[in-house]
Amino acid sequence: MQHLYAVETIADLRQFDPLCSEQLRTSGYLRPGDGGGGDFYWAGEDNQADDGGLVLKSEQTPKGRWRRISTGQLDIRQFGALPANGDVTQQFQKALNACRKGGSLYVPSGHYTIRQPLMVHQGTTVHGDGLLSEIHYYGPAKTGCWNAAQRTPATAMAFAGLNTFVHTQNSWAYHLTGMSFSRFDNLFVHLRCANTSAYYGPGNGESPYYNVFTNCHASGPGGEANGCIAFDWAAYDDGIQAPNANQVFGGHVNSLQVAVRCQGTGNIFHGQVLEMVDVGYEFDLPKNRYDDVSKGISNDVMGLYTEYAKIVFEQRHETCYLMAQTSMVTGHKELFRGKSKENCVLLSSHSGQLPMNRSFFEKAINFRPLEFK
């Protein structure tokens, strides 16, 4: 039987001679009590690459590795991603790479700075403490903080309880391309500058399909025409495909230009709350389909609550069909702005007149069934 030796940090572990003991405990990663410590054992024949968290190389001998005794759930602090500790992109990515074959990665409360896109692998669940788990993204323009490591075939993963801040113009929090059958739960996105998006999903043959969003929020920087979009589901990559068959339940969107920009079909938006947006739902065709033989999309909006959405529904092509029902609409200028009311249904208990829009009445857009020959 061996004694369990203890050291303060991972750096001390690397300097510890395994001949003295093959069982070792660290009190922290960079300092005692920082949450990145744990129990390790010495694998004398192991030559696996050092990943900075689960497998650690010794400075005393080239052969053998210290291996963390894992309880199943990984913690980003085990890889040196500590709150308020500067740029922790590399440490975050090492923790995500440790989930290449699936796994659960915990992001505890704190402020984390990320400066490059993070790649998430198939079967990974990333979860935190909600508003308190702050990921501040300063990555390059035209990139997203959270990305699928593999796009073809599409991958399934899950995110929950994270608060992502976007600090670079023309960038995004979640880049959904390549994600299908995935879950997004209790997420917060703060868009801190203009022309940014929260949940961004163009196609290029890898459109996001069959995903479920529950209690996912987005807030913008405010101001007129800030160019920010919460659910940005347009066909930017190739002008043909956009997200299809996704479901959004609940969530609060405020202080940005467009709450939902949708160019896909079969998406369901249920019980959302929108405040202070220029456009609530913008339905359009991908630009390369305007002259295509096959036209048309159809999406549903149910149980909508809005305050001060200038245009609640905007139909930008006459074949963008919608079925919508609102529970509360106030402070808007136009309830529906569209190219055609045919083959659409809109039920609302409120008129389209300012200032308060509280007169109750029955409202329906005419519906004519399609005729097939």
Language model features by range: what are they?
Residues L13-S21, L96-K101, V120, R151-P153, ...:
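Flexible, charged surface loops at secondary-structure boundaries
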Residues E22-Q73:
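Short, surface-exposed terminal/edge motifs of secreted or surface/virion proteins that either
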